[in-house]
Amino acid sequence: MSTFDAAPVALIVHAHPEPQSFNTAQMATAAQALRDAGYRVDVLDLYSDAWAPVLGREEFAPVEGYFKPQAEQQRAVEEGTLDAAVEAQLDRLLAADLLVLSFPLWWFSLPAILKGWVDRVFVMGAVFGGDHGLFGDAALAGKRAMLLFTTGGPGESFRPGGAIGSMDDLLFHIHRGMLEFVGYQVLDPVITYGPARMTDQERAAALDTVRESVALVAAGPRPAVD
């Protein structure tokens, strides 16, 4: 097996509409840190790719009567009729040893385009349910995932007793309800607080911190190679 084949794969799913944003610069910094550590990095830019986030009945074979999205996902997996765009994304997801969700924190959660990616690509019957279980028995067990994001507010707002409250509490629905649910080991998030309020020098220092934080992630345990 070649060194290239043996390299772990990181999939970065990026969701920011502005290519010149600090958030996008943060994603690029993280991607380079992973490459420097020997990862093959696959970057999926949802806005650039004009990803359609809505999970609807039109992407499935005709359904008579009541439409249940997850049941139709599982049927599409079993019958080999998944929407081509979804199947391509699913293949990239399953090939990755590390998933990085890169985004600005909007309304204390994921931007709609990224939540829609999860809705459509975390396919029932392919990553959980059907022949797979949940959590430790789901299809992505043994793989790692992390959040890489920016906030509008300062760090002190996201602490226990702060104006917003504990960041751990805020992220529970993503960490537990999305990532751990399909089997991932969830790593500590990499967060830049309030970059819009920083000077250029402070933003440069923040990117250095991101680089160092992601390098530590990359240096952590990696999946065994057959």
Give residue ranges: language-model regions:
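Flexible domain-boundary/linker segments
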Residues: 27, 58, 116, 134, ...
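Short, histidine-centered active-site or binding-site loop motifs used for metal coordination
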Residues: 14-16, 152, 191-195
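Short, glycine-/small-residue-rich phosphate/pyrophosphate-handling segment
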Residues: 127-181
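N-terminal beta1-alpha1-beta2 submodule of the flavodoxin-like/Rossmannoid cofactor-binding fold
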Residues: 2-127, 205-226
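Pocket-edge positions in alpha/beta enzyme catalytic cores
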Residues: 78-81, 137, 198, 202
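Hydrophobic/aromatic beta-strand patches that form the interior of the parallel beta-sheet core
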Residues: 11-13, 42-44, 146-148, 187-190
